[in-house]
């Protein structure tokens, strides 16, 4: 009786489909994510450095110091490409202090790398900002070591002439300041809510 019931149930019940073998590699996503985070700074820094050096090479190859080029005629009153040699800091500040700024640039590069290595997981935008600052600092440092001065060329008429390395540094600092201030505000709000509760 029991045997016949078992045989009937076995005949009625469809055979279970075998699932394909899919080995689970624990930590694969974690490793990919960690690798992605580790290359943010060098990748962004390299992009900023290459863009800066290519733009300076084009200016150096096509314009004499003091010479200007106006790629867009109707923008001439507001912006142009002007070849300027800068022996000072960003935007032409503190001229003829090249050796001092080489030392400062080396310290800044070391500080960025140290700070980056001690950042917790995540913090993508902060890492991008550090990459921009590192690439910009290296771009201007390369100029000082190779030429003895920095090549500036972006001329907005009402502002000191600057270059793409300066732009990368300023954008990187702005991003970093925004996220640090935002995190500080969120922390203060959290502490305020805890005190109220």
Task: Give each language-model segment a name.
Residues 2-197:
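Alpha-helical transmembrane bundles and membrane-interface segments of multipass inner-membrane proteins
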